[in-house]
Every structure is written in C-alpha cells, then in structure tokens.
A protein has these predicted regions:
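Structural microenvironment flanking redox-active thiols in thiol-disulfide oxidoreductases
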Residues: 64-114
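Bacterial Sec-dependent N-terminal signal peptides
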Residues: 1-23
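Solvent-exposed loop/turn segments at secondary-structure junctions
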Residues: 61-64, 96-101, 128-130, 159-160
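Short, internal strand/loop/helix patches
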Residues: 90-94, 105-139
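Short active-site neighborhood of thiol/selenol oxidoreductases, capturing the structured segment around
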Residues: 44-70
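Thiol/disulfide oxidoreductase modules built on the thioredoxin-like
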Residues: 126-165
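N-terminal "domain-start" segment that seeds a small globular fold
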Residues: 21-44, 65-70
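Loop/turn elements at helix/coil->beta-strand transitions in domains of secreted/extracellular proteins
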Residues: 51-54, 85-90, 118-120, 140-141, ...
C-alpha cells in the first residue's frame, strides 16, 4: 500500500512539474528563463542583459524579413534623440531553427547579416525550447517585450502592422 501511495505521489509531482514547464506566456506573466548560444557558442540568458527592457524576436528563418519595418522603426528610436533609451533597452533575435528546412550553416549566415544590420545579438534555439517553455508558435515571427523584471509587457505574433509602431 505504501508503494502504491508513493508511486501516485511521484507521478502527480512529475505531472505538475511537466505542466509548469509548458506554459503559454501571457502579458503580465514572468517569463521563464532559458539558455541559448550565439554562432560562436557563447551562452546567453535573459540575465545577460540584466536591468534592461528586452525586445526578443523569435523568428522562423523562412520569415526572417517579415518585421524588418518594425525593427527599423525601433532602431531609429534607440539612436540619439529617439524615444527609447539605448542604455535601458536591448533588442535581439532568437532563431527558431527547429521550424525550418534550411541547413544550420545557411541560417547562421542569414543571422550574421541580420546581426550586422541591426547591430545586435542573434541566438539559436535548436530544439524549439521557447515553443515549449513560452508557448510560442512555430513557423512564425513573434516579438516579445519583457520589462527589466522579465515580466511580459507585449506579445506580437506574425506581421506587426505599421500602426503599432
């Protein structure tokens, strides 16, 4: 009987643990952390930019240009005289490599060009981690805005209309 009760408790805890990991991130939620690498193998977490508001572009490489107009507008606002304080803001990309047929070598080349264009960091999600941890859609372009405490302040899926920026 003790073994049966112990087994049930272990299974229940395991199920709760699995459900806690698979969350749909919503505005107002604290975002679960992650660890991703850049093209050189350097590891990054959200704490790599501690104290900054984060604009995270989670991108399927097949639609990597979809929100360039929005990113151009944000880049303009982070320059001198803009409305965004570049000392308190960091925009970067996470490539959803699991959602594409493109080879990783080509993806790294495309990402390198984007990193230069927007003077930013590009990280790689090879396993679809944010699809599982944050409930982000695959085969899409999603922009997530987190405040300095890593609370979600905005989620934009797909193309961002000009009226939003």
């Amino acid at each position: 009987m003790k073994k049966l009760v112990l087994s049930i408790v272990v299974i229940a805890i395991s199920m709760l643990s699995m459900n806690a990991q698979n969350v749909n991130l919503k505005v107002g939620d604290k975002a679960p952390d992650w660890v991703f690498t850049d093209a050189d193998g350097n590891e990054f977490t959200m704490n790599s930019w501690k104290g900054k508001v984060l604009q995270i572009n989670y991108v399927d490489p097949d639609v990597s240009d979809l929100n360039d107009p929005a990113n151009d507008a944000i880049k303009k606002e982070t320059k001198a005289g803009g409305r965004i304080d570049s000392e308190k803001f960091k925009g970067f990309g996470i490539v959803d490599t699991k959602s594409t047929w493109k080879p990783n070598m080509l993806i790294r080349t495309i990402a390198g060009n984007k990193a230069k264009k927007f003077d930013t960091t590009i990280l790689f999600d090879y396993k679809g981690t944010l699809q599982e941890k944050w409930g982000l859609p695959k085969d899409n372009y999603t922009m997530v805005i987190l405040d300095k405490d890593r609370v979600c302040r905005g989620i934009y899926k797909g193309e961002i209309p000009e009226s939003k920026f």
